[in-house]
Structure formats: structure tokens, C-alpha cells
Amino acid sequence: ACQLITAEDSRGTQLHRALRSTSKVSKSTSCVEAGSYCRPNVKLCCGFCSPYSKICMNFPKN
């Protein structure tokens, strides 16, 4: 799952933006949700791109 974290000061100015993701692609600003079509290394899934079905999958929850 992806979470976009933002912090604002009292004037409403954006101070910090960080993408929290379980994927190894941490510099991406957006990711494709599970169930969407993907190709490895082309569309970045929030989880991972299944090489067989070409569909974004969520990482298993532990």
C-alpha cells in the first residue's frame, strides 16, 4: 500500500513530502494500484508487477 505523507507549517506551506511504500522504488511520486495492467520496469506498482498475468499485485500481508 502507498501513503503520501505531507507536513505543513502554520501558514499551510508544504515542508516535507515522502512516499512510504513497501516496494524498492522509493523515489517514485506515484504508483499503480493492485488490479491495474503493468509491465515490469515500465509501470510502477504499489506492490509488484506479476510477470505472468501482467497485473499489479499487493505484497502479502504478514
From Swiss-Prot:
CC per GO annotation: extracellular region
Subcellular location: Secreted
Propeptide intervals in chain numbering: 8-27
Tissue specificity annotation: Expressed by the venom duct.
Disulfide bond entries: 31-46, 38-49, 45-56
Keywords assigned by UniProt, alphabetized: Calcium channel impairing toxin, Disulfide bond, Ion channel impairing toxin, Knottin, Neurotoxin, Secreted, Signal, Toxin, Voltage-gated calcium channel impairing toxin
GO-annotated molecular function: calcium channel regulator activity; toxin activity
Secretion signal, residue range per the UniProt entry: 1-7
Domain topic, free-text comment: The presence of a 'disulfide through disulfide knot' structurally defines this protein as a knottin. The cysteine framework is VI/VII (C-C-CC-C-C).
Family: Belongs to the conotoxin O1 superfamily.
Function statement: Omega-conotoxins act at presynaptic membranes, they bind and block voltage-gated calcium channels (Cav).
Protein name in UniProt: Omega-conotoxin-like Bu11
Source organism per UniProt: Conus bullatus
Lineage: Eukaryota, Metazoa, Spiralia, Lophotrochozoa, Mollusca
